[in-house]
Amino acid sequence: MDDWKSRLVIENMLPHFNMVGNRQETRKLQESGTSKRRQEGENFHFTGMADGSYPNKIKRPCLEDVTLSMGPGAHPTSLSTEMQMPTLNMNPTSADLGVAGQSLLLENNPLDSNVVNSSAMGSPFGVPSTADTGLKGHAVPYYEKNNSMPAVDQELQDLLEELTKIQEPSSNDLDLEKILGSKPEEPLVLHNPQAPLGPPAKLPVQMPHMESLGSSKEFASSCSQVAGTSLPIMPSSTGMSYSIPSSSKQIVSSSSSTAQAQVKNQVQNMLPVTMPPLSVPQWHHAHQLKALAASKQGSATKQGSNRNWSSLPPPGLSPPYLPVPSPHPPPPQPPPPPFSPQNFTASCMSSSSLSGSAVQSSPNALLSSMAPSSNASLGPTLPYVPAKLPGLPLNQQPQFSPQSSILANLVSSSVKSPQGHLISALPTSTPGPSPPYRPENLSSPGLPQQSFTPQYSLIRSLTPTSNLLSQQQQQQQQQQQQQQQQQQQQQQQQHQANSIFKPMTSSQQPKTLSMIMQQGLSSSSPEAPEPFTFSNTKPLSHFVSEPSPQKMASMSTHSRQSSLLHYLPQATPAHAPSATASSTATATLQLQHHHQQHHHQQHHHQQQHHQQQHHQQHHHQQQQHQQQQHQQQQQQQPDQSSFLLQQIMQQPQRFQRMMASDSMPALPGQGCCHRCAWTSTALWLEHQHQQWNSLTSTHGHVPPSNLTHVDKACKLGEARPPHVSLGRQPPSRQALGSESFLPGSSFAHELARVTSTSSYNTSEAAPWGGWDPKAWRQVPAPLLPSCDAAAREAEIRSYGNDP
């Protein structure tokens, strides 16, 4: 511990040495003063990684790396790469330089930072490769530690919290990088500080090349290629060194998976297995890949490390995820091999120490959640990374996109709830990651999301439940996955049962969260996700596309409902009522039209009816309010509501047909028939309302008998869009809608009075005593027809039959 602290101090000093290469390093180091302190503790963690005695702390550095990368947010991967690169550079000087300089560059210019990194930081990056090599030595213990460390969650949570609070992840990353890089690097790379610097120069070249490739793709490629060279951890380079390595593939799969939703569980479970592979054999390759990844990440960071989390090099990561990029990296790859030992360190750093040792794995899960980790996980957590990088798709399935994990409190964060929550918060701030969570994004990025099959099964289960994930992601991801699967089934059932109501129920909570995130994030996520989705995600895109349509459908339904809701004063409480309301509103309008005819026929009864109706409407309003509350409660009971909606939606058709037959006769002679048919309809409505009440009676409101079909009609009418009630029947609309007509007939007057009073906006309506066209106007149009129809129905039901 003390030794490492001294090393940290030395590393802190080293950045000054590196300052020759990069002046910003000192400033960065100063910025990271506290970060370094933290990293010193983390250094202990790394020591723990090396020694196996500080697993948690190791994780912390990983988290720092991951979260720091997240902090920049733009390029979690880039940041991670930066961090990793510098740490790898820990050739004591260049590493710090690379880290600090790159961090500064990242902070200053996410896009330029890569270029700067290429030059000033480029060498640091190159060194990071060396540093990776240096880290490599510890990388094995690091991974192993990660595997063995259950404290990862706590550490990750702490780190995430700190990261959330700290927006200078670059400085933290630099410190961590220095710590990580210096610790492994010092053993491996310290002897080579300048040599890494030389390679760093190469790395800068490679980095520019990667940059040219589109840092993400190149990064992925380089990682992949290095992976080919050093299959194990190159993915770390690509994705945090998780993905690409072939030998690392197990690690990648496991790491990715672990980094993914199961970062913790899988990391602990799989990483143990995969970590060993990452160990020495992969380290070399991983370090090489790491060097490439560091340079790549540098470019990725450059792209917008802070800006677009989803924009992150996730695309780059994604490419790494695809081995295809692997050939791409060949140019950078050669330098990485020189640094392969350090590269591995960078890889570990990169991938949050690759799979990042379980410790970093969790952080890596965060990183993964962030693009970088996603990249790192790309190989291992291909699903997780794609989910994350594609995050867009992921966003649909919170499953594993950084966005998803973030939005959904990170499925991955579900895996590590604390991280997930923190990252959720972080990614939440970064809409980019969140959008992947969005189902909408899922369709486009979602493809990549599920393109990562390893956890695709999980992702698929999560994808449908992404909305629920947003709600439940706070829970353990495994539990979430199970629950989400169940919920997904339920949602699917509900969706099938009632696509309209389903958005209500499933989206009520997720809707706000997932809908907002989906909408807001989906816009941002498509940007980053698309790159990810390119070749990586497309293979599995067909998988995601299916879930995404559902989510998008639900989303569209949500948007439709939301669009309708603002029309419906009380429709919002119950979306299902709104759906029913539209159909019921039509029936109500028809009834209203019939009632108008009947009303004209029985105009002499209208006075009494109106009074009674007025009385009823007061009672009815109360009932409606109760019903509204009840409906709100009903929404909480989606199953009943959906079932009820189905019945209502089905019944309204019959009711409409009945009403249509009723509306046909306009002659007074047929008035009785209208009355009878309408009465039967009213009874049917009442019965339906009773059913509704029985379904929702658990919350108990006015007894169904007390609640007349009029009440239900008013409620439904309110719920339904105003245009529906007015537009369905021109006659009733004329009677209700045209003031010239309304004042013309006592029916109009009564209707106006009833309407104004029956509407929930009765406060605006004129007194019962008289009818005020203006007051009537004040009442929402939809409410007027529906409430009028409801009031009349109440009248007719109770008094309409009296001669």
Curated annotation (Swiss-Prot):
Compositional bias annotation for Basic residues: 592-622
**Does the entry feature the keyword Lipoprotein, yes or no?**
no
Region of interest called Disordered, as start-end residue ranges on this chain: 22-50, 292-374, 420-452, 486-641
Query: What GO CC terms are in its UniProt record?
Result: centrosome; Golgi apparatus; nuclear body
User: Does the UniProt entry include the keyword Glycosyltransferase?
Assistant: no
Share an example GO biological-process annotation for this protein. Answer: spermatid differentiation
- The residue ranges flagged as biased composition, category Pro residues, are 312-340
Q: Where is the composition biased (Low complexity)?
A: 347-362, 571-588, 623-641
- Polar residues: bias regions: 296-309, 363-374, 441-452, 495-526, 547-564
Keyword tags: Activator, Nucleus, Transcription, Transcription regulation
SS bonds (residue pairs): none
Quote the subcellular location field of this record. Nucleus
What family, per the record?
A: Belongs to the mastermind family.
Primary role: Transactivates the HES3 promoter independently of NOTCH proteins. HES3 is a non-canonical NOTCH target gene which lacks binding sites for RBPJ. Required for testosterone production.
Q: What is this protein called?
A: Mastermind-like domain-containing protein 1
